[in-house]
Regions:
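Sec/Tat-exported extracytoplasmic proteins
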Residues: 18, 27, 42-45, 115, ...
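Active-site acidic short loop of glycosyltransferases
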Residues: 14-17, 47, 74-75
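Hydrophobic beta-strand anchors of alpha/beta hydrolase catalytic cores
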Residues: 20-21, 52, 98
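Hydrophobic pocket-lining residues within nucleotide cofactor-binding pockets
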Residues: 1, 57, 115
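Thiol/disulfide oxidoreductase modules built on the thioredoxin-like
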Residues: 67-75, 80-125
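Structural microenvironment flanking redox-active thiols in thiol-disulfide oxidoreductases
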Residues: 32-72, 81-88
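N-terminal "domain-start" segment that seeds a small globular fold
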Residues: 1-11
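Short active-site neighborhood of thiol/selenol oxidoreductases, capturing the structured segment around
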Residues: 9-32
Length: 126
């Protein structure tokens, strides 16, 4: 999967881990509010079981995408391509939306509205 930082990562790199796919946009206030929680979750859990991946809702490309990621202080990887076709959960129609993909690569939950790290961990456990 190509990332905004210019690297590419195969999905197999995250084998056995939960994927937290977060759709965000710069103009979305609640999206900006949840970024620190998502940064924290990714920093604490990416190596051990839960990877946060961002998707810019507006489909920005470089260099604009990198500028916005910097302004919003997003620390987790941002995908260049929407993973929705891979998982089939439907393109979000509002923001923010966070999709939980379980370690078996199945859609576990689609969550609408801003999320906290604790809420995402609880949703994964339910």
């Amino acid at each position: 999967m190509p990332l905004a930082d210019g690297t590419a990562v195969p999905l197999s790199q995250w084998e056995g881990r939960w994927l937290v796919i977060n759709y965000w946009a710069e103009w979305c206030g609640p999206c900006r509010d949840e970024i620190p929680e998502l940064n924290e979750l990714h920093a604490e859990r990416a190596a051990t079981g839960m990877v946060v991946l961002g998707v810019n809702y507006d489909g920005l490309v470089q260099p604009k995408l990198g500028e916005v990621i910097g302004r919003m202080d997003i620390k987790f990887p941002t995908l260049l391509k929407d993973p929705e076709p891979t998982y089939g959960y439907g393109r979000p129609e509002q923001l923010p939306v966070t999709v939980l993909i379980n370690p078996a690569r199945e859609v576990h939950r689609v969550l609408i509205g801003p999320q906290t790290a604790s809420a995402l961990l609880a949703a994964a456990a339910s």
